[in-house]
Amino acid sequence: GVTALAIVIFGLFLIYPLFSLFASAFQNAETGGFSLENFVRFFERKYYYQSMINSFWVTTCVTALAIVIGTTLAYFMSLYTIKFKNAVEICIIISLLSPPFIGAYSWILIGGRSGILTQFLQETFHYEFPSIYGFAGILLVLTLKLYPFIYLYVAGAMKSIDSALIEAAESLGCSGIRKVATVIVPLITPTILAGALMVFMNAMADFGTPMLIGEGFNVMPVMIYSEFINEVGDQANFAAAMAAIMVIITSTIFMLQKYVVNRKSFPMSSLRPMQVHQMTGIRNVIMHVLIYALVAVSMIPQLVVIYT
């Protein structure tokens, strides 16, 4: 019954497309026979394999930045009193909901060559706004789009940490940064890696952002699309080979992540959740300003779309 239906759906929408993809990748466009020429062509020409290097580089940078931003935000949101916390969390979730190309389009309207902010700074202060095109633009858009994955994962994990562990560490003289590095981070590492995998997969597969603001910084999804729609008829097999390489890369990263998580994961039960503290003085002001600023910048794509 249900199991058979699930198997049919799984085979129809996952196994068959993957089988067709790899079959096409290993097929000679002219003879239709088995061939490795598509893969040889990819790795022989720098124009093609450079797109793989670019994809891996930008994806790694996006993932690293998302981990830093998302984990830091989750730490302060979980352990300190934040005014309008619920509203902040709603905005974080909303910033995650829109497609990445909306973010790229919005940043073009703001900071593109004829963008609102670009023209304002140029006409008022004669200041040339930094280009949002190329690697830097892709990094900006994808990081602001994807760090909420890390935040949501880590914020959930922070709630399951037992305060007894923190108190035990403090009684042994472990506090501040050392406490975070030696107690909290190891406890949430599996969760961080799970969120990082989501960020990595989304950044690697994203097509809209580099298509709109890449400008010469070629990445695999854009290259695959360009080859597939090429007017020359034999490019579909080559595009399939490039897609197969992406599948192999992402599958390898997935298995590596699962291996590391299985070695580092352990059950946690929060009998006494960690207490929320009230930060005071200038540090409290700085914390609120930075959190609000980050969320406001993350919401720019949605606000621009609404405004325009």
Enumerate the language-model features and the residues they cover.
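Short hydrophobic, aromatic-rich alpha-helical segments embedded in or entering the lipid bilayer
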Residues: T31-E44, E215-E227
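Transmembrane helix boundary and interhelical loop/hinge segments in multi-pass membrane proteins
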Residues: G32-S35, V154-E167, G176, M204
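Alpha-helical transmembrane segments of integral membrane proteins
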Residues: M255-L290
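Glycine-rich helix-loop "coupling/hinge" segments at transmembrane-helix boundaries
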Residues: L109, F207-G233
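Glycine/proline-centered hinge or cleavage motifs at structural transition points of membrane proteins
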Residues: L172-C174, P186
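Helix-loop-helix hairpin linking two adjacent transmembrane segments in secondary transporters
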Residues: Y225-I249
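Membrane-water interface segments at the C-terminal ends of transmembrane alpha-helices
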Residues: G1-A29, V40, E44-K159, L187-F207, ...
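Short amphipathic alpha-helical coupling elements at transmembrane boundaries
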Residues: Q27, E37-R41, E89, Q119-E123, ...
